[in-house]
């Protein structure tokens, strides 16, 4: 099973904007075909971003989006990350560190600073935008119930 780390903007694509590039990720996540990992720092950032006025969310809507996401992810414990390249945007370093610590296969992001690091062979995981990550997902199959 693929293990994914989603940056905050991709989470917003899934749970707020319904971006078409991210729909296959949402389908795979809801269908249990991928494992999505988060930690306290990434969840804290999401909680903070959901209060931004430009999203035009009521407090109830923000809580709902946070709850829906946090119910679908596995919370990974905090810990020491291996040596990693430095992301130009220091706020995004936490996503690199989480992907390395949890042995993710893919860090899914639209952030240019993170995407610039994708050619690094020492990472141990791929850094892809939502469309490229979606192309790697297994085809969705409905589970039949007896």
Give residue ranges: language-model regions.
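PIN/NYN-family metal-dependent endoribonuclease catalytic core
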Residues: 5-6, 22-51
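Hydrophobic/aromatic ligand-binding patch that stacks against planar heteroaromatic rings
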Residues: 28, 98, 117-119
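Conserved glycosyltransferase catalytic-site signature
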Residues: 8, 89-93
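Metal-dependent nucleic-acid phosphoesterase active-site entry motif
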Residues: 1-19
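Acidic, PIN/NYN-like endoribonuclease modules and their adjacent C-terminal/linker elements
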Residues: 85, 93, 102-106, 112-146
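Membrane interface segments of multi-pass transport proteins and intramembrane proteases
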Residues: 55-56
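Acidic catalytic patch
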Residues: 41, 63-86
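Short secondary-structure boundary segments
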Residues: 8, 40, 110-112
